[in-house]
């Protein structure tokens, strides 16, 4: 596994400042403590980096709600048991890398103590152009918190500058070889941390999508791997709802539909379906430009609708889509119905 010493050495080589190495040197976890590991690491992060003012600022930007309440309410109000949780983190502005780690741990902590007995499995994706050099730092802290390493998809196309010999060793093995609770991919991209929570006992939905805005595209092979891994954990008798996430330039949707037809033939899908066609960028100019892009072509919409014609869009689909996009700045939004399928097209930006 990644050690404190190996991370500190990498941080020194990349000249990113001594504070992360200092923190790792001072990090002490007590397995015999009544306080959970995740809380121990969170507390030390908060103290060492003095994150109090920054968490307060994050709270202020969210109507002064306490951070723990924001996380708890977001989950409890979400009406499906698989959550894509997006935190807008200003890596280049006023929020620090340590604070992002704190939020990761806090989110896991909130779900772990929820009344709904979660979480059980995570598929964690860290996408940010500034997290590459801190990837091992983040991975180590999560290891300390929950006792499992993050692994990449073998097919993940990570930018060359993020590669290290140790990281490459991790991706040479079989995709999702680690059966611990956390697995994921570090890539380039805009300012966000995305959680895909696949809860093996209670999940009713799976999220499928390409994230080209963050330079990470889930290949068809990865898509199949994710589905097979999911069913290996939940059992093939469990049916799930389906949320298709596409974007304006998604050329792989037809291949994904072919894979979904296989699942349908195995009677693995429920009737509910949501389709969101999105194009979220980091700036308003690009978002306004994307507003003129048609989105899913008509023939592709027909393919989607034809495949999903026996399924239905839940009555609260609009509300769920709104919760998915969260506080994105929307420049263009259109929803239309093809048969009984509701498709939302959204173009916007993160401020």
From Swiss-Prot:
GO cellular component terms listed in the entry, alphabetical order? cytoplasm
The UniProt keywords, alphabetically, are: Cytoplasm, Glycolysis
Q: What else is known?
A: This subunit is only found in some Pichia species.
The annotated phenotype of a deletion mutant is:
Decreased growth on nutrient limitation and reduced cell flocculation compared to wild-type.
> What subunit structure does UniProt give?
Heterododecamer of 4 alpha, 4 beta and 4 gamma chains. The gamma chain bridges the N-terminal halves of the alpha and beta subunits.
Q: What does this protein do?
A: Structural subunit of pyrophosphate--fructose 6-phosphate 1-phosphotransferase. Not required for catalytic activity. Fine-tunes allosteric regulation of the ATP-PFK by ATP, fructose 2,6-bisphosphate and AMP.
The record's gene field reads PFK3
Q: Its domain of life?
A: Eukaryota
Presence of the UniProt keyword Cytoplasm in the record: yes
Please give the InterPro entries that the UniProt record associates with this protein.
Answer: PpPFK_gamma_sf (IPR038615)
Please report the name of this protein according to its UniProt entry.
Answer: ATP-dependent 6-phosphofructokinase subunit gamma
Q: Please name the GO terms of the biological process aspect recorded for this protein, alphabetically.
A: glycolytic process
Q: Where in the cell is it found?
A: Cytoplasm
């Amino acid at each position: 596994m990644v050690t404190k010493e190996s991370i500190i050495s990498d941080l020194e080589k990349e000249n990113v400042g001594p504070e992360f190495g200092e923190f790792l040197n001072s990090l002490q976890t007590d397995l015999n403590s009544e306080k959970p590991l995740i809380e121990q690491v969170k507390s030390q992060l908060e103290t060492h980096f003095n994150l109090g003012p920054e968490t307060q600022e994050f709270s202020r930007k969210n109507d002064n709600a306490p951070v723990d309440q924001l996380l708890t309410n977001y989950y409890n109000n979400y009406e499906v048991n698989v959550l894509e949780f997006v935190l807008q983190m200003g890596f280049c502005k006023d929020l620090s890398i340590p604070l992002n780690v704190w939020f990761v741990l806090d989110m896991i902590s909130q779900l772990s103590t929820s009344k709904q007995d979660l979480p059980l499995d995570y598929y964690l994706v860290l996408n940010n152009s500034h997290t590459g050099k801190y990837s091992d730092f983040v991975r180590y802290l999560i290891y300390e918190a929950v006792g499992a390493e993050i692994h990449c998809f073998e097919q993940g196309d990570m930018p060359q500058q993020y590669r290290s010999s140790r990281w490459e060793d991790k991706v040479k093995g079989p995709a999702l070889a680690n059966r611990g609770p956390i697995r994921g991919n570090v890539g380039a991209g805009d300012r966000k941390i995305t959680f895909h929570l696949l809860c093996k006992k209670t999940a009713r939905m799976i999220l499928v999508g390409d994230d080209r805005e963050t330079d990470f595209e889930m290949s068809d092979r990865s898509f199949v791997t994710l589905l097979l891994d999911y069913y290996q954990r939940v059992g093939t008798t469990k049916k799930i709802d389906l949320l298709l996430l596409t974007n304006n330039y998604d050329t792989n949707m037809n291949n994904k539909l072919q894979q979904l037809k296989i699942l349908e033939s195995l009677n693995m899908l429920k009737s509910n379906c949501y389709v969101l066609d999105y194009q979220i960028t980091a700036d308003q100019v690009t978002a306004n430009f994307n507003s003129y892009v048609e989105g899913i072509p008509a023939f592709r919409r027909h393919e989607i609708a034809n495949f999903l014609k026996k399924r239905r869009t839940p009555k609260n689909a609009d509300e769920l889509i709104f919760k998915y996009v969260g506080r994105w700045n929307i420049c263009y939004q259109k929803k239309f119905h093809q048969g009984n399928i509701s498709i939302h097209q959204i173009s916007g930006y993160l401020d």
